[in-house]
Curated annotation (Swiss-Prot):
Part of the 50S ribosomal subunit. This is Large ribosomal subunit protein uL14c. Keywords: Chloroplast, Plastid, Ribonucleoprotein, Ribosomal protein, RNA-binding, rRNA-binding. The lineage of its organism: Eukaryota, Viridiplantae, Streptophyta, Embryophyta, Marchantiophyta. GO terms for biological process: translation. InterPro entries: Ribosomal_uL14, Ribosomal_uL14_bac-type, Ribosomal_uL14_CS, Ribosomal_uL14_sf. It comes from Marchantia polymorpha. One of its GO terms (molecular function) is structural constituent of ribosome.
Length: 122
């Protein structure tokens, strides 16, 4: 469950290292984001000489959460960190690589490009 003011790691090579969620995309009073949801975030840490700079406003999709996520088949999945992938307006990732495991629910949310770049899909 990601809410405003939550810090997230970045799971791609776009140049950002840490993000802070400032808005959950959806209905006007939506409080939390889960795996596969889009957020608006600000870059808190960035790698030098990369396209994404510190204090830049970006869109990102949640790929891992510490909070348990219950699947339809009854199994529960949770990760060690909160992580997101920076995307553009069309929903394609800005980076060319994705690090760490990715949840299978992203395929159902039509983020197939992120799933294809991921080294492991759980």
């Amino acid at each position: 469950m990601i809410q405003p003011q939550t810090y997230l790691n970045v799971a791609d090579n776009s140049g950002a290292r840490k993000l802070m969620c400032i808005r959950v995309i959806g209905t006007s009073n939506r409080k939390y984001a889960n795996i596969g949801d889009i957020i608006i975030a600000v870059v808190k840490e960035a790698v030098p000489n990369m396209p994404i700079k510190k204090s830049e406003i970006v869109r990102a999709v949640i790929v891992r959460t510490c909070k348990e996520f219950k699947r339809n088949n009854g199994s529960i999945i949770k990760f060690d960190d909160n992580a997101a992938v920076v995307i553009n307006q069309e929903g394609n990732p800005k980076g060319t690589r994705v690090f760490g495991p990715i949840a299978r629910e992203l395929r159902e949310s039509n983020f197939t490009k992120i799933v294809s770049l991921a080294p492991e899909v759980l």
